[in-house]
Amino acid sequence: MHDQQYLNDYFRNHWKPSLDAYTYSAYDVIAKKIESHEWLLDVGCGYNPFKSLVSHVVGVDPAMDQADFQVTIEDFYATKLFDVATCLGSLNFGDDAVVGRQINKMVSHLKTKSRVYWRLNPGRRDHASEKCQGIPFYPWSHRRLQDFAELHDFRQVNEQTETNGRVVRLYAEWHRS
């Protein structure tokens, strides 16, 4: 089941970010990997923190008013192709079909030579709010992400397991040239 209304309510009213405590996927760490001429598509941008860190960024998020486009990635249409995408906890919900569609759509907005930076919840209902028990977390593993990478002609690198002191997440990068 993929209930976008439930997810939107959860992220608007119950979720609290703690992203900069991560080693590999903190905003400032990733921002340093993005060159000043590159365009970033931030999928599930939340409060859109890359706006103050990256020269050219478009944030997409269905739940948050701070997004440049307040829509799901499936409903987002761009007039340009992007050099880089970030999916920092945003494509974590639903089954193989839902996640596959979301990745297909995100990749369709990228240039042939591009990168994607990922932070993934490996299916754990470990958010601070009890409301997260109703969320259909996707059971991510580095192997599952690798399968999607290969499907889209990306090379997956820098696989890591990281924590922010409270939860464990997976990190990886995709590179395509």
Region locations from a protein language model:
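Short N-terminal helix/helix-N-cap motif within the alpha/beta-hydrolase-1
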Residues: D95-A97
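Internal amphipathic alpha-helical segments of the cytochrome P450 catalytic fold
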Residues: D68, V99-G100
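A short glycine-rich, Lys/Arg-flanked "PGG" loop and its adjoining helix->strand segment in the class I
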Residues: G100-T112
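Short catalytic micro-motifs in class I SAM-dependent methyltransferases
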Residues: G89-F93
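A conserved beta-strand element that flanks and buttresses the S-adenosyl-L-methionine
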Residues: T86
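Class I (Rossmann-like) S-adenosyl-L-methionine-dependent methyltransferase catalytic domain
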Residues: M1-Y77, R115-S177
